[in-house]
């Protein structure tokens, strides 16, 4: 059963859209809280959510501020309303609290994709007591050019205002990825090797929009917090952490950077950290050709850990 609702953000009162898929039969195994990536929306995760629901998992996802239905106007897509990373994390926290209130007896598995993978790590840095397992999907490796991106975003914001859409930062961030797959003749080819998925993404008004400087500053702050492992509270060191990514994902940079990302969570204090790369897959492994194997592997891992 699909359930849709919304809540007012504790950060600024913005209406945040939420969707849940509830299995038809009890008992439920656990709750999976999903956190989506940049320039997309929660409905893109319905196939994965349906798969998990059939296995007995309650699955909950919300639209980030400035995404999907969590906007005041359609023109606000890619604008975070000045709340920055902190407001995004507060929204994740609110959903997390609501889940625990509705299902106090169930374990909670937190999973984030791409930008969402940065957000979930920034979240557990302070709130890992609220999470029983963490799944990090399509994680961007730490980008040493981030300070330059921050400087550009701040300068553009000061000159043009927070709603200015930064084509410069967009090109700096994703231009290399587009070039890597230029033979596919799609600027979004780095997202997925399935041409139908790439085409649908390009044609959707809710996908692929250019971030404002306001949103880029939030993104950069999420990356900073996700990789600042020295400041993780790590009150739940036995929490299992699974990293899954496509080996051809340009956000990964390379295998060495992926391994470094996995090690970073171990340095943060977590004892049970595993990483898996999928050959031939790009950024959106949940939408890739062969995604059924990814779904299966994630489900097997959750069950192996007792969820």
Predicted segments, located by residue:
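Active-site glycine-rich loops that stabilize anionic/oxyanionic intermediates
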Residues: 29-32, 36-40, 114, 247-248
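Short beta-strand/loop motif that positions the catalytic acidic residue
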Residues: 243-245
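Conserved alpha/beta-hydrolase
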Residues: 44-75
């Amino acid at each position: 059963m699909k359930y849709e609702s919304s809540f007012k953000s504790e950060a600024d009162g913005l209406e945040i859209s939420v969707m849940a898929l509830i299995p038809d039969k009890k008992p439920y195994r656990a709750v999976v809280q999903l956190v989506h990536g940049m320039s997309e929306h929660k409905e893109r995760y319905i196939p994965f959510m349906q798969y998990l629901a059939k296995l007995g998992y309650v699955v909950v996802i919300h639209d980030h501020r400035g995404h999907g239905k969590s906007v005041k106007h359609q023109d606000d897509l890619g604008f975070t309303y000045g709340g920055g990373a902190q407001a995004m994390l507060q929204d994740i926290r609110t959903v997390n609290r609501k889940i625990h209130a509705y299902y106090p007896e169930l374990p909670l598995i937190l999973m984030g994709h791409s930008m969402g993978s940065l957000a979930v790590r920034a979240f557990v840095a302070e709130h890992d007591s609220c999470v029983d397992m963490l799944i990090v999907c399509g994680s961007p490796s730490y980008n040493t050019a981030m300070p330059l991106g921050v400087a550009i975003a701040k300068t553009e914001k000061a000159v043009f205002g927070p709603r200015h859409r930064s084509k410069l930062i967009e090109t700096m961030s994703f231009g290399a990825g587009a070039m890597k797959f230029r033979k596919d003749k799609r600027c979004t080819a780095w997202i997925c090797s399935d041409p139908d998925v790439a085409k649908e993404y390009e044609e959707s008004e809710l996908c692929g929009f250019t971030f404002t400087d306001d949103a880029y500053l939030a993104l950069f702050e999420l990356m900073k917090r996700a990789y600042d492992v020295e400041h993780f509270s790590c009150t739940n060191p036995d929490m299992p952490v699974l990293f899954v990514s496509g080996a051809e994902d340009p956000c990964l940079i390379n295998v060495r950077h992926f391994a470094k990302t996995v090690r970073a969570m171990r340095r943060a204090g977590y004892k049970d950290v595993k990483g898996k790369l999928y050959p031939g897959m790009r950024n959106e492994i949940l939408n890739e050709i062969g995604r059924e194997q990814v779904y299966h592997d994630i489900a097997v891992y959750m069950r192996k850990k007792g969820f």
